[in-house]
Amino acid sequence: SNKPFTIVGDGKQKRDFTYVTDVANALYLASNYTKTDIFNVGSGKPKSINYLVKLLVGDKVYIPKRPGEPDVTYADITKIKRKLSWQPKISFEAGVKKVLKSINNWHDAPLWTPEKINKATKDWFKYLD
């Protein structure tokens, strides 16, 4: 759409973006791990919201920062790299390109409204009787 991107705060805050296939691969490896453990999954390389919008190419609208919002969040992936030999394969920039390349596939995707969810749920439950 031609709507501007809404950026909370100044856009300099950084987040850890991870492409879905990298997350799926990490979950697969963790599910085959024979010990009980906790792993962080991410890129370990946070990117600013302004940089994301620059890659998306669009106008920006800034709104005030929310109270308590952290400036930087990212995953420490040291343990998952060491124990599962996992690391992300898709760079942030490549991931954004992949999403943009397939974005038109989502234009005709059905939207789930509360009414549609209620109807679908009712339909599902009739098969359980």
Listing of model-derived features with the role each one plays in the protein:
Residues S1-F5, A30-Y33, L55, D59, ...:
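Phosphate/oxyanion-binding loops and surfaces in catalytic or ligand/nucleic-acid-binding neighborhoods
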Residues S1-F5, F17-F39:
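Alpha-helical substrate-binding/gating segment
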Residues K3, G9-V20, K45, P67, ...:
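Glycine-rich "substrate-gating" loop/helix at the edge of Rossmann-like oxidoreductase active sites
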Residues D10, I38-F39, K47-V53, G58-T78, ...:
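C-terminal "lid/loop" region of Rossmann-like NAD(P)-dependent oxidoreductases
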Residues V23, L27, V41, L52, ...:
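Non-catalytic, hydrophobic alpha-helical segments
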Residues D16-V23, S48, S91-F92:
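An acidic site on a long C-lobe helix of protein kinase domains
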Residues F92-D129:
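Amphipathic terminal alpha-helices
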